[in-house]
């Protein structure tokens, strides 16, 4: 047993130059843990509250001094004396201390920072890597990476409506080889875009952010890049999309406006038709947030039409919340959940969401946020839970590569027991 003797938070910066919360946990044994909280650009209405100061004279109102003070002045005294390995007890104590359904009093960014730092300190105390401490000796599956190589929507300053166009190197025999394949396609895409006279600057998540004629054109140039890199789309590499449709859903009309394509006033059924058409024309294996987070009828229709052959991921739809997920499971909506630790605010609740998804036959995709840091905790979480998939950006920007590098270290450490399932990680669809 090693008790917590001090918890300290500070304001640091994320990959967009915005403040976020870093937390350090100290124990009587000398074990130590540190974690930094990520932040999203496109956020679901039902996410746990990210506490910002709102003081326009500091960081344009995005400061997190209040969240930092909540850690140092309220949470720290409460959890001092806890056994650092009592993750569930510590998380529960913070949830009760906050006392709101959405962590709006103390802030999910304050609570999560402590939750993650506690896990790091506990792993340090028992002398195990974080993935092994959290997952035990069954933690051995490396996730299939979903690499966002073209950014659009709120993640880029371009005219592309859909937020992310991803490649999934499912044909690789190992995680290490999947990274090589992804990097080669990424560099091939840069050459393809350059030859077409298109911008090769990158967006928030490290993918390219060119102005394109349509969302379909984004898929076309990626196919060209896959072939240029020497791979075959639909065999070695599949495609995925995070549509983030809540970002272009018109609440006043109840319709979808694809401004980049000049198509407005689309109904839910017309959006579903569009996705079905794209899936016939391209080897798309995963679609995230195809309809607005509150358009459950639309999600139901999408699931009925293509849910047997395409992974349908709920991000804004489920917000890593077991109550939302349980409702989706009951109604037969989507077949996968995106797991973002800061949407719910504690590791304990994160693991509960993953477990609920697996019991229901849903896949779970561990995910970064668009505002990231050098913290690579989610890489360990993906392996600890044998999630099978991870979404953590493109093949550029250190804040994204940090997660891939950590997974490469884990695979190397696991050696022969490491498992990379590739296409088998999409176990609930027909491929």
From Swiss-Prot:
Its cofactor is Mg(2+). (2R)-2-phosphoglycerate binds at residues 163, 340, 369-370, 391. One of its GO terms (molecular function) is magnesium ion binding. HAMAP family: Enolase. Keywords: Cytoplasm, Glycolysis, Lyase, Magnesium, Metal-binding, Secreted. It is an enzyme of class 4 (lyase). Its main location: cytoplasm. Mg(2+) binds at residues 242, 288, 315. Binds a second Mg(2+) ion via substrate during catalysis. PANTHER family: ENOLASE. Pathway: Carbohydrate degradation; glycolysis; pyruvate from D-glyceraldehyde 3-phosphate: step 4/5. It is found in: Cytoplasm; Secreted; Cell surface. One of its GO terms (biological process) is glycolytic process. The keyword Magnesium applies. CDD domains: enolase. The active site is at residues 205, 340. It catalyses: (2R)-2-phosphoglycerate = phosphoenolpyruvate + H2O. Belongs to the enolase family. It comes from the Bacteria. GO terms for cellular component: cell surface; extracellular region; phosphopyruvate hydratase complex. Pfam families: Enolase_C (PF00113), Enolase_N (PF03952). Its EC number is 4.2.1.11. Catalyzes the reversible conversion of 2-phosphoglycerate (2-PG) into phosphoenolpyruvate (PEP). It is essential for the degradation of carbohydrates via glycolysis. This is Enolase. The keyword Mitochondrion does not apply.
């Amino acid at each position: 047993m090693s008790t917590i003797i001090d918890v300290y938070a500070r304001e640091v910066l994320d990959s967009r130059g915005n403040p976020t919360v870093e937390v350090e946990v100290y124990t009587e044994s000398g074990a130590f843990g540190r974690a930094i909280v990520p932040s999203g650009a496109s956020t679901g209405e039902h996410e746990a509250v990210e506490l910002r100061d709102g003081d326009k004279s500091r960081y344009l109102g995005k400061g997190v001094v209040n969240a930092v003070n909540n850690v140092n002045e309220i949470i720290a005294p409460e959890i001092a004396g806890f056994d650092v390995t009592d993750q569930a007890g510590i998380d529960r104590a913070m949830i009760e201390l906050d006392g709101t359904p959405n962590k709006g009093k103390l802030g999910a960014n304050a609570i999560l920072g402590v939750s993650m730092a506690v896990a790091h300190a506990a792993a340090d105390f028992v002398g195990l890597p974080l993935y092994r401490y959290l997952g035990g000796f069954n933690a051995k599956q490396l996730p299939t990476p979903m690499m966002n190589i073209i950014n659009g929507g709120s993640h880029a300053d371009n005219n592309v409506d859909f937020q992310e166009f991803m490649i999934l190197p499912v044909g690789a025999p190992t995680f290490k080889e999947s990274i090589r394949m992804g990097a080669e396609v990424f560099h091939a895409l840069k050459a393809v875009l350059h030859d077409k006279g298109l911008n090769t600057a990158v967006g928030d998540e490290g993918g390219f952010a060119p102005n394109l004629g349509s969302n379909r054109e984004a898929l076309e140039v990626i196919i060209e890049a896959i072939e240029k890199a020497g791979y075959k789309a639909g065999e070695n590499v599949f495609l995925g999309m995070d549509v983030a449709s809540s970002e272009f859903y018109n609440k006043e009309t109840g319709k979808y406006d694809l401004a980049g394509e000049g198509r407005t006033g689309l109904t839910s059924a017309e959006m579903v038709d569009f996705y079905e058409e794209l899936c016939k024309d391209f080897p798309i294996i995963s679609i995230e947030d195809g309809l607005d987070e509150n358009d459950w009828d639309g999600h139901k229709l999408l699931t009925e039409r293509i849910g047997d052959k395409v992974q349908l991921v709920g991000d804004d739809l489920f917000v890593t919340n077991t109550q939302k997920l349980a409702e989706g499971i009951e109604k037969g909506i989507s077949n996968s959940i995106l797991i973002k630790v800061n949407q719910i605010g504690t590791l304990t609740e994160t693991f509960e969401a993953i477990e609920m998804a697996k019991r229901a036959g849903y896949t779970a995709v561990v995910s970064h946020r668009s505002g990231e840091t050098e913290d690579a905790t989610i890489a360990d979480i993906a392996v600890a839970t044998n999630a099978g998939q991870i979404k953590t950006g493109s093949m550029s920007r250190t804040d994204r590569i940090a997660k891939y590098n950590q997974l490469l270290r884990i695979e190397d450490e696991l050696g022969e027991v490491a498992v990379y399932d590739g296409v088998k990680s999409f176990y609930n669809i027909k491929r």
